[in-house]
Amino acid sequence: MGRDYYIFSNGRIKRKENTIYFEDFEGNKKGLPIEDIERLHIFGEVDLNTKFLNYISRYSVLISIYNYYGFYSGSYYSKKKNVSGVLLVNQALAYDNYEFRVAIAKTFIDSAMHHILRNLRRYKEKTSEFVKAIENERKIMKEAKTIEEVMGAEGRARKKYYESYNAFLKFLKNDFHFNKREKKPPNDPINALISFGNSMMYTTVLGEIYKTQLDPTISYLHEPSTKRFSLSLDLAEIFKPLIVDSVIFNMINKGMIKKSDFDTDEGICYLNENGRKKFIKEYENKLSTTVRHRTLNRNVSYRELIRLECYKLIKMLLGDEDYKPLKAWW
């Protein structure tokens, strides 16, 4: 099993025999054995050619591209080896059955709210009012009849959740402050952390979907569109509070991230290269952390939990068993 590699410098990628070389514009080279690469994340300005893409396609390496501010721009992935016409038809039929689609969407958000509440209850002396508000939105969501109602309850719950961030920040006694969630563009360090973390989460989920027979463009909570892998957005809802928020709180709590790790350009606040490296290190550590799985009776990593979620969705779509989303028990 390969690993993720991150390229922050500007340069070019070349292939020599069975090794990929990254060469920066000063002539420094670093070899990356192709068998060891599972995903390649490119943050710098990097030149590559079709020969390179044809070569890595044989090994099903997923390439994710990020813009100047570190936000996800798109992916290159080879022709899928794991395909199933039956599953594709069932995945589309599930979307076309509106009542069934709403039911699936509700399970994603119920899991997300479970993990949001889990985070809040760790600081219960500071967050009790937010817990009550989100629990109320969770009840409303469970009675929803439309996707709009589901997303409305989710949006209100997440707004309350983000309002609780200052309770966390004050409790942790640090220099960060958070007014409200601003996505386009992020305008302060906390918003920059959330946006960058969510962007990484989407690419991680996409990578796990890609290993299965699921089609990443057919989704249930988020409306499918022509320019996004919307199923990764659906499944990321489950894991953002469990992984991304946990990393953010941990880094702030331990003083691992500083204001010097952020830059601002024309009102856009973003993690600079040093900040991105710090975040990715902790993010990868979180993904590799293991828990004892109650059903499988073995240790599984957080990354594997994402793929297991894909498999559970497949079983539901094939009619093998009901879908029960992950709800952290540890």
Swiss-Prot record:
Sequence positions that bind Mn(2+): 154, 222, 237
Cofactor: Mg(2+); Mn(2+)
Domain of life (superkingdom): Bacteria
Transmembrane stretches, start-end: none
Top-rank EC class of the record's enzyme: hydrolase
Keyword Oxidoreductase annotated: no
Enzyme Commission number: 3.1.-.-
GO terms of molecular function: DNA binding; DNA endonuclease activity; metal ion binding
Assigned keywords, A-Z: Antiviral defense, DNA-binding, Endonuclease, Hydrolase, Magnesium, Manganese, Metal-binding, Nuclease
GO biological process, one term: maintenance of CRISPR repeat elements
Functional summary from the UniProt entry: CRISPR (clustered regularly interspaced short palindromic repeat), is an adaptive immune system that provides protection against mobile genetic elements (viruses, transposable elements and conjugative plasmids). CRISPR clusters contain spacers, sequences complementary to antecedent mobile elements, and target invading nucleic acids. CRISPR clusters are transcribed and processed into CRISPR RNA (crRNA). Acts as a dsDNA endonuclease. Involved in the integration of spacer DNA into the CRISPR cassette.
Family listed: Belongs to the CRISPR-associated endonuclease Cas1 family.
Quaternary structure and partners: Homodimer, forms a heterotetramer with a Cas2 homodimer.
Name this polypeptide is given: CRISPR-associated endonuclease Cas1
Organism: Clostridium perfringens (strain SM101 / Type A)
Taxonomy of the source species: Bacteria, Bacillati, Bacillota, Clostridia, Eubacteriales
Gene that encodes the chain: cas1
